[in-house]
Amino acid sequence: MVESGMMYNLYLIGHFILALLWLGAAIYLDFTFLSGFNKATTEGKKTMIVRIRSLSDRTEMIASFFLPLVGVLMIIDRTFWLKVGVMHGKILLALIAIGLYHASRGVLKKLEAAVVEGNPTEGLQKRYVMFRMIVLIFLVSTVAMIVSYKGVISTFFLISSWLG
């Protein structure tokens, strides 16, 4: 299928870039937490949580707001996507991922408070990791759905056609 219309192409590129931003940030933040939190001192844990929240605010929070917005604009522009069953699954997984992402942020705030107060953090750590892993699995699944339905392939084709 050949997409026409400049706005749809901009939406497609923006959607693709935001998805990559969120996925890349999620992988980096999860790796940072899993590789260093248990080994860190109390001050190190506080610093790590502040850094994770800061980077999450600047990347994942923005992506989790604008990705659905741009997706809705794409669907408004090309309503035939509402007839594609894979798209319904993609939207469902994306909305669940956004909800669990926000839940993981709440757990991270509780974890930060527990570290500051000196309370046990093991249960909160497990809950945070569980939420983050589910979000990561849903994000990868959503990207896989896009690849399987030629969304990313057409995005790559569009970008390469503009470059040369």
Regions found by a protein language model. Give the residues of each.
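Polytopic transmembrane helical bundles with strong interfacial aromatic enrichment
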Residues: V2-G164
